[in-house]
Amino acid sequence: MKKHYETDLDYKKRLIDRISPTYCGAKWYNATIWLGSGRTTSCHHPPAHNVTVKEVVVNFKRLHNTEQKKDDRRKMLAGERPAGCDYCWRIEDMGTDKVSDRVYKTMAYSDEDNLLAAQTPIDDDVDLRTLEIAFDRTCQFACSYCNPAFSTTWVKDIKVKGPYKDLTTDGRGHFTHIHEHDQLYDFHETNPYVEAFFAWWDDSLHRTLKELRITGGEPLMSGHTWKLIDWFKTNKDKSNTELAINSNLGFDLSLVNRLLDSTEGIKLSVYTSNESMFGQAEYIRDGLEWTQWLTNVTYLLESKRLKNLNIMCTINALCLDSLPEFLDLVAGLKRTYGWQSLYISLNIMRFPSFQGPLVLPEHLRQHYKNRLVEWHEKNKDEKLFGEFELNHLERLIDYLDIVKTPHSEGFELASHQRDFKSFYEQYDVRRGKDFRKTFSPIMLEWYESI
């Protein structure tokens, strides 16, 4: 963990570089696991990979300790860069003073745990300290940058209206089929991955985990989420694990109150998503009602029942149009409820690439970069945002200015720009939206030129 007098960069030099120039504690101690599909990864940046049913039936710790992760651990300790961690390498390659997410991921664990990881034999199974799980993909939203792998509303869209057409750069097929492999079991069927998780939870996870974070889909729509919450209520003396919920907060206050009432006496953090304002937010995050979302955010802050509330911003091309105003909103909430009551992260979207910020032409990237620079200069001295938050903003500014390709896969700008327009033209028809009435004149001028 970072010492109180250290900067993020100081911490990296003192601890991480001492272990290895490419070490990341998340590869040992963190996992995101999609139990509906039997897929796992060490954080939200590397592509997920499969875990077989046979593996988890024999050893439930294989939900995390896969051969691929063990090979990545070996590479990191040898100073090599695992290919799946390309997001962090691209941030760091912008300059030696740039802090990537692997620093923040590692910082979540004690110095002792990180040094122990370096000494643990590669073939050993490691106990998790932080875990994010998704039980299924049930979700009432169908955000533009999401897909059927993570949303049943997206599944319905593809089933009813068919695949999106003529997207030449979507090599991963985000929008062409219903991704049946991402929900292998119906809700009434026994899911061996869910059973393996609960077996591991009962055996040792409830003791080794610092934080359990439930995501989705929308996790408050899953019965398994409420089963876990009930476990916490009746076993408060058995676990020090803190509970966190990822939620789009797209529901009325009765469900918010159910969550608060069900977790009374439990350390709870809520992570919600948004990155733009008003109609632009409703356009990007289809299913969101702006007023409802903001009402729920304010209600949670006023309740003073949470450890903290976190807003995760998925930085895509469209949200840049009103991101400074969204940051103003967050600053206002911090002034009202205290700067530590609310945190924000700016997570740069890379897939689908044709929706990412680098699809924009140079003049628009510079325009949005300059607006963010202006916002940063105006607000940096008010002390409303922590070092982590300001670093996220500064690296986004640098990313818009310096980085030209979002990942190591092919990126031909003109083709991605054509797909940008093709997708949103179809999106408007399918979702009853209107790009031209939603975004700013400078964005629209470029859009019409494609």
Q: What do these predicted ranges mean?
A:
Residues 1-64, 96-107, 155-158, 262-266, ...:
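Radical SAM enzyme [4Fe-4S]-AdoMet core and its adjacent flexible, acidic
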Residues 2-5, 59-114, 126:
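Cysteine/selenocysteine-centered motifs that mediate thiol-based redox chemistry or coordinate metal-sulfur cofactors
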Residues 7-22, 112-129:
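Short linear interaction motifs
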Residues 20, 81-84, 132-135, 139:
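Short metal-coordination and nucleic-acid-contact micro-motifs, chiefly zinc-binding Cys/His arrays
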Residues 25, 29-42, 121-149, 209-213:
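N-terminal pre-triad scaffold of radical SAM enzymes
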Residues 70, 112-122, 189-203, 253:
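A Trp-anchored, charged/polar loop motif used as the substrate-binding/catalytic surface
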Residues 89-93, 146-152:
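Detector for the c-type heme attachment site
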Residues 128-138, 149-193, 207-225, 235-255, ...:
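Core AdoMet radical
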